Amino acid sequence: MSSLGASFVQIKFDDLQFFENCGGGSFGSVYRAKWISQDKEVAVKKLLKIEKEAEILSVLSHRNIIQFYGVILEPPNYGIVTEYASLGSLYDYINSNRSEEMDMEHIMTWATDVAKGMHYLHMEAPVKVIHRDLKSRNVVIAADGVLKICDFGASRFHNHTTHMSLVGTFPWMAPEVIQSLPVSETCDTYSYGVVLWEMLTREVPFKGLEGLQVAWLVVEKNERLTIPSSCPRSFAELLHQCWEADAKKRPSFKQIISILESMSNDTNLPDQCNSFLHNKAEWRCEIEATLERLKKLERDLSFKEQELKERERRLKMWEQKLTEQSNTPLLPSFEIGAWTEDDVYFWVQQLVRKGESSVEMSGYASLFKENNITGKRLLLLEEEDLKDMGIVSKGHIIHFKSAIEKLTHDYLNLFHFPPLIKDSGGEPEENEEKIVNLELVFGFHLKPGTGPQDCKWKMYMEMDGDEVAITYIKDVTFNTSLPDAEILKMTKPPFVMEKWIVGIAEDQTVECTVTYENDVRTPKLTKHVHSIQWDRTKPQDEVKAVQLAIQTLFSSSEGNPGSRSDSSADCQWLDTLRMRQIASHTSLQRSQSNPILGSPFFPYFANQDSYAAAVRRTQTPVKYQQITPSINPSRSSSPTQYGLSRNFSSLNLSSRDSGFSSLNDSSSERGRYSDRSRNKYYRGSVSLNSSPKGRYGGKSQHSTPSRERYSGKFYRLPQSALNTHQSPDFKRSPNDHDRRVPRTIPGMPLHPETASKAGEEESRVSEGGWTKVEYRKKTHRQLSAKTSKERTRGNYRGRRNF
């Protein structure tokens, strides 16, 4: 303020008598008041502090600029005192019933008043002032009807800066002001065009749209206020010039005043303008249509915004997934058993590069190569091996063990998958198919009632054909196409609608879709559209014959081991790898609270589907064993192998009615397993429980590499566990001590007390590697003394009464 040499007239706060609130300016509220000492009605704008507005007003003096009287400088009371415009703001006048009296002369007079006031600010004031917030609310009507420009709170001296902050109200703001770009005085020209549009249409600019929406429409879509088609041409041209996107093309206020004067001399313009003003009902629909279009555009924008947010969310998830994948080392090839030392070197490099302590682990890749670690050796490495190689950090050892375990798990899961790219030079794979005949019977149950309106019906689908055909049906879907009925999908028989449907509509049909399992090569599904008609007699069923071409699973692998997906795999190495994984899973699951799998009796079968499945797996020759332990290789050609295995695994082994005997119903089956147990169970127990020699255990003449490596890693049973689970027939006199040796189960260690007896049994191994076992039948007295309840408890596969 001192730079301009302005001296303010200071008015005491007590010298003012305040009345009602007249509205608000840019940075304060305006009140009507009486300047007591001067006996003058004034307007007082209360402020938190005196800023640039008083500085600007103090140097301005024009008929169309609000007159400045002085300031209030009594803390905390600060304010600006100006003349009072008794007729209110131009905005209030336009949006009231008084605006209906406006005519061509009225509009021209007021348009000229505003233009002259703005021309004074730009060209004739002591310092050029850019208002930047010109709008109908900041134009007031004095008592004599003259328009005066007020509220300079957003104004700037042009020689101070031309880069303005975001101020003003969006519908009146020029695009460069909205974007906070450097501005010139023509930004006020844009606002003047909006004020002139308000006087012509007596409408609120961009009514119903939010400020930011208007800003987006003006800047991004280059939208402007609608100029009605019946608007006089001279006014329309002036508005278009004021709203040019390029600020340099807009006219100055000197040019606008000249245009208004020429329009006043046009004798035809008054009639055109008055006709336009009085026929507002005809052209108002054009403005409303534009507003509706802009609102729809805004709604589409909101929808696109939500869509973009959803896409951004999905991209973030995808980015996170890629980040997680990037932390997984790249594999030289999926056939880990064929990895060379260089392949292992590459894998370790990828692994240590992803770790946090990559600098400390950078030399480990060379360490693996120096120790000649190939793919087969890599998957069998243990903690002691890593220490022997020179990896002493416990954290680094855990890091490598976790990576190797994950690599082993992934390899075993993918072992039986066929290659994506087949070798053209190799032998063609056997592709066996079998044909299953199936007849699908479609019909519906009908309760006739009195007619089609109150009858009840429901659709069904039956099957006839080969017994195994039902195992190839994945699901059956009934679609009635009724508005209040849902699509019914069933995965197991009986395939019939659960609820009755009341009434039969005209041309009522039901679309039945039968989907087959993945091992059905053709067809993948069968569709049938069944017509529902009302008839008191039994409706005729429709039969559709289907031939299913079944792709036989693992048939070529069982008949020809060389045709497996990985024929070059080392069976002994894979068996060792599988046994190691089973042992690691066993140690992890011993701490779980499952009463059966967590008990000391089942350390070996903790990761098996059922006891029977584990026994069958133990009896299967090595050449037919699959790596995945949850599939029974002896039934690999059966299409229902997974379903049966899953059903067996769901049995509760601890329940009374679902013991091991429930897994085999026929006596011949139990006898067959009894014969096998005599020949194989003792042999397996001896080889699995032989004491280890050295770190990896000693190799016996008849033991497999996998069993000799893990021979010393099974848990011994405590005496309390044996005493708890013994059958009552074991509680005999001390003379029967030699008959209290419990029946061994494959994979279970011998009791410490019976270890010496096991050694004796091992010493009696015959030439073929089988163990001689003498069985003694109970006397008639012992058998008769056994209760029926005890007989039931002891009658299950896996336990033998001595």
UniProtKB/Swiss-Prot annotation:
Q: Does the keyword Nucleus apply?
A: yes
Q: Which residues carry this modification: N-acetylserine?
A: 2
The biased composition feature labelled Basic and acidic residues covers 667-678, 728-741
Which residue intervals define the domain SAM in the entry? 339-410
| Compartments in which it is found | Cytoplasm; Nucleus
Q: Which InterPro entries match?
A: Kinase-like_dom_sf, Prot_kinase_dom, SAM, SAM/pointed_sf, Ser-Thr/Tyr_kinase_cat_dom, Ser/Thr_kinase_AS, Ser/Thr_Kinases-Pseudokinases
Give a short account of its post-translational modification. Activated by phosphorylation by PKN1, followed by autophosphorylation on Thr-161 and Ser-165. Autophosphorylation in response to ribotoxic stress promotes dissociation from colliding ribosomes and activation.
What Pfam families does UniProt report for this protein, alphabetically? PK_Tyr_Ser-Thr, SAM_1
Q: Give the knockout phenotype.
A: Knockout results in fully penetrant lethality at 9.5 dpc due to severe cardiac edema and growth retardation. Embryos show polydactyly of the feet. Defects in stress-activated protein kinase signaling cascade in response to ribotoxic stress, leading to impaired activation of the JNK and MAP kinase p38 pathways.
So which domain of life are we looking at?
Answer: Eukaryota
Catalysed reactions listed for this entry: L-seryl-[protein] + ATP = O-phospho-L-seryl-[protein] + ADP + H(+); L-threonyl-[protein] + ATP = O-phospho-L-threonyl-[protein] + ADP + H(+)
Q: What is its EC number?
A: 2.7.11.25
Compositionally biased residues, Low complexity: 643-666
**Which segments show compositional bias classed as Polar residues?**
624-642
Q: What family does the Swiss-Prot or TrEMBL record give for this protein?
A: Belongs to the protein kinase superfamily. STE Ser/Thr protein kinase family. MAP kinase kinase kinase subfamily.
What is the purpose of this protein? Answer: Stress-activated component of a protein kinase signal transduction cascade that promotes programmed cell death in response to various stress, such as ribosomal stress, osmotic shock and ionizing radiation. Acts by catalyzing phosphorylation of MAP kinase kinases, leading to activation of the JNK (MAPK8/JNK1, MAPK9/JNK2 and/or MAPK10/JNK3) and MAP kinase p38 (MAPK11, MAPK12, MAPK13 and/or MAPK14) pathways. Activates JNK through phosphorylation of MAP2K4/MKK4 and MAP2K7/MKK7, and MAP kinase p38 gamma (MAPK12) via phosphorylation of MAP2K3/MKK3 and MAP2K6/MKK6.
Subunit-level organization = Homodimer. Interacts with ZNF33A. Component of a signaling complex containing at least AKAP13, PKN1, MAPK14, MAP3K20 and MAP2K3. Within this complex, AKAP13 interacts directly with PKN1, which in turn recruits MAPK14, MAP2K3 and MAP3K20. Interacts with EIF2AK4/GCN2; promoting EIF2AK4/GCN2 kinase activity.
**Name of the protein in its database record:** Mitogen-activated protein kinase kinase kinase 20
